[in-house]
C-alpha cells in the first residue's frame, strides 16, 4: 500500500495559470458568488499521506480517501486545513468561529448549517472534481433528537458535539488516475463587486495557491511502513467498555422480547470500548488504511478531537442531482485460495438469514430515497452483489433516484439518517429502544462523516469502524443486529470482534512507531505557511 519514496518528489507546472481564466470568472460572477479555480502540478512521486503529513500537526485538518469496489483506489483524495469557518452544535446551541470571533445561534443544527451553506452559490464545472470546497466534518447519531420525539440518553460521558464542521475554501485534490494534484481555491465575489474587485480577489487566490505549491515543494523525510517491522500479532492489553458483558446480554434479551411482541423486526445494540494509548492518530490511520482499505477512509482533526476511520458503507450521496445509498449486509471472510473465495461468496448469497436482512435494508433505502426523489425514479441499480475487500466480502446493493427540484442534500440526508444497518427497523421504534437499553449517548458512532459541497454535491458515510481520539484515550464503538433468533452470547462476541479489529490497529501503530518520534511540525518552514 505504501510505496518507498527514497527521494524528494519532482513538482512541475506549479507556475501555470489558473483555470478558469479571470475573464471567465468575471462572467460567472453574474450568477455565482463563490467560484472554484485550480492550478495543476505533476505528482507522480507523491502520495496523499505524504502530502497530508505536512499538515497533520495543524489544529484543524482533514484527509478523505477511498477505495472503489473493494480493491481499486478511487480517483480522488481530498486534503484541507485552516478552515475559514468552524461550526459546532450541541443541545440546541450552534457556535460559529470565524477570524477569532465566536457567534452563538439558538437553532436546530441542520437549519443553521443549511442557512450558512446557502450563502454560497458555486458552479459545477465539468473539468473539476465533485468536491471543490465546502463543509467537512461529522453528524452525531443523536442529531435526530432535534427532529423526532426520542428519549434523551441519560449519560453522555464522551461529550462530543452533535455536529462539527470545517468550512474550507481551499482544497488539495490528488488525482490518482492522472498522477497530478489540483490545488483548488475559491474566488469570493462580494455583493456589488466590480470587475476590478473580482480581478483582485482572483489574484489573491492565485497568490495563496502558489504559496501552497511552494510549501508542498518542501522535502518530506521518507517514511513508509517498510521502514518498520509489521508485527504478526499484538497484545491488546486491558480494554474497558461502557457496559458489562452481563448488561449487554440482558439488553439483547430485552430487545428480543420487543421483537417477539411485534414492536420491531430488528434493532442494533452497541457498546463503546476504550483504551489508553500514546500512539499517533496519523500512524494509526496509516495502519488502518493498510489493514482495511474501504470506500470511505478519513482523518479529521478538529482541535483536541481526532476521528479516523475506514467505513465500508455510504449513508447517502448527492452528485449532480442524483441521490444514492448503498446498503451493506451480509459478511464472510475472504478465502485463502480463489476456489475457497468463490465458495464463500456462493455460501453467503445462499444464506437465507443474510438475504432477508439485506432485503429489509434495501427496502428501507428505497423508502428513504422515495421521500426526496422524483416520482418513478427510485431504482435498484445493483442488487445483492458480492463486493470483496482485503479481509472480508459483503453483499452490497445500490439504490438511486433523481432528487426532486424542491429538495436539497440536507433533505436527502435527513431522509436516510440513521441508516437501518446501525439502528434497526422500523427505524423510529428501534431508536427508542436503543435509547432505553444503551442509556449512553452514541456520539459520532452510527452518525455520518463526509463533505457538503458549496456546489450542492454531498458524500457521506456511516460512522462505523471508526476511532475517536481524545487526549491519550481512544474510543471504538461497535454494534450487532439483534433479530428474533439471536444468541446473546454470539451478539456480544460480534461487537467485541468488530472493536478488536480497530483496537489492533492502535496497538500495531504503537509497536511500529514509538512515541519518541518527533512530530513532523518540528521541520515545518513557517515561511511557506499562508493565511486564508
Please place each PLM-identified region on the residue numbering.
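Intrinsic, low-complexity polybasic segments
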Residues: 4-5, 10, 224
Amino acid at each position: 500500500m505504501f510505496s518507498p519514496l527514497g527521494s524528494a518528489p519532482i513538482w512541475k507546472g506549479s507556475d501555470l495559470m489558473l483555470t478558469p481564466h479571470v475573464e471567465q470568472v468575471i462572467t460567472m460572477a453574474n450568477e455565482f458568488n463563490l467560484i472554484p479555480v485550480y492550478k495543476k502540478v505533476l505528482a507522480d512521486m507523491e502520495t496523499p499521506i505524504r502530502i497530508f503529513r505536512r499538515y497533520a500537526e495543524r489544529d484543524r485538518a482533514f484527509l478523505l480517501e477511498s477505495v472503489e469496489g473493494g480493491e481499486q483506489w478511487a480517483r480522488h483524495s481530498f486534503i484541507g486545513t485552516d478552515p475559514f469557518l468552524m461550526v459546532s452544535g450541541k443541545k440546541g446551541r450552534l457556535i460559529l468561529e470565524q477570524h477569532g470571533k465566536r457567534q452563538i445561534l439558538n437553532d436546530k443544527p441542520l437549519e443553521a448549517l443549511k442557512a450558512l451553506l446557502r450563502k454560497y452559490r458555486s458552479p459545477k464545472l465539468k473539468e473539476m472534481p465533485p468536491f471543490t470546497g465546502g463543509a467537512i466534518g461529522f453528524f452525531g447519531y443523536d442529531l435526530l433528537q432535534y427532529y423526532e420525539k426520542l428519549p434523551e440518553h441519560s449519560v453522555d460521558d464522551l461529550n462530543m458535539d452533535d455536529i462539527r464542521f470545517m468550512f474550507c475554501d481551499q482544497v488539495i485534490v490528488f488525482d490518482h488516475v492522472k498522477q497530478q494534484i489540483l490545488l483548488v481555491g475559491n474566488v469570493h465575489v462580494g455583493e456589488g463587486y466590480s470587475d476590478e474587485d473580482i480581478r483582485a480577489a482572483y489574484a489573491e487566490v492565485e497568490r495563496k495557491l502558489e504559496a501552497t505549491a511552494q510549501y508542498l515543494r518542501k522535502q518530506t523525510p521518507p517514511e513508509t511502513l517498510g521502514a518498520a517491522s509489521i508485527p504478526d500479532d499484538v497484545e491488546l492489553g486491558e480494554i474497558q467498555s461502557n457496559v458489562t458483558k452481563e448488561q449487554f446480554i440482558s439488553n439483547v434479551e430485552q430487545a428480543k422480547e420487543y421483537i417477539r411482541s411485534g414492536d420491531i423486526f430488528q434493532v442494533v445494540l452497541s457498546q463503546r470500548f476504550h483504551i489508553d494509548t500514546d500512539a499517533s492518530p496519523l500512524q494509526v490511520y496509516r495502519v488502518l488504511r493498510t489493514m482495511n482499505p474501504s470506500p470511505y477512509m478519513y482523518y479529521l482533526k478538529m482541535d483536541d478531537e481526532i476521528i479516523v476511520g475506514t467505513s465500508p458503507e455510504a449513508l447517502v450521496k448527492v452528485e449532480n442531482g442524483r441521490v444514492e445509498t448503498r446498503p451493506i449486509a451480509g459478511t464472510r471472510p475472504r478465502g485463502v485460495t480463489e476456489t475457497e473465495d468463490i465458495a464463500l461468496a456462493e455460501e453467503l448469497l445462499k444464506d437465507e438469514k443474510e438475504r432477508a436482512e439485506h432485503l429489509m435494508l434495501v427496502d428501507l433505502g428505497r423508502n428513504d430515497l422515495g421521500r426526496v426523489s422524483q416520482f418513478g425514479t427510485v431504482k435498484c441499480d445493483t442488487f445483492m452483489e458480492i463486493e470483496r475487500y482485503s479481509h472480508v466480502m459483503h453483499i452490497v446493493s445500490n439504490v438511486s433516484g433523481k432528487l426532486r427540484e424542491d429538495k436539497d442534500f440536507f433533505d436527502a440526508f435527513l431522509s436516510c439518517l440513521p441508516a437501518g444497518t446501525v439502528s434497526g427497523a422500523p427505524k423510529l421504534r428501534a431508536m427508542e429502544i436503543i435509547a432505553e437499553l444503551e442509556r449512553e449517548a452514541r456520539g459520532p458512532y452510527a452518525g455520518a462523516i463526509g463533505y457538503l459541497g458549496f456546489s450542492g454535491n454531498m458524500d457521506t458515510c456511516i460512522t462505523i469502524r471508526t476511532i475517536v481520539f481524545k487526549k491519550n484515550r481512544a474510543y471504538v464503538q461497535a454494534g450487532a443486529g439483534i433479530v428474533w433468533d439471536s444468541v446473546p452470547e454470539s451478539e456480544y462476541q460480534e461487537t467485541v470482534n468488530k472493536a478488536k479489529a480497530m483496537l489492533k490497529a492502535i496497538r500495531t501503530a504503537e509497536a511500529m512507531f514509538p512515541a519518541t518520534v518527533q512530530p513532523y511540525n518540528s521541520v515545518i518552514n513557517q515561511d511557506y505557511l499562508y493565511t486564508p
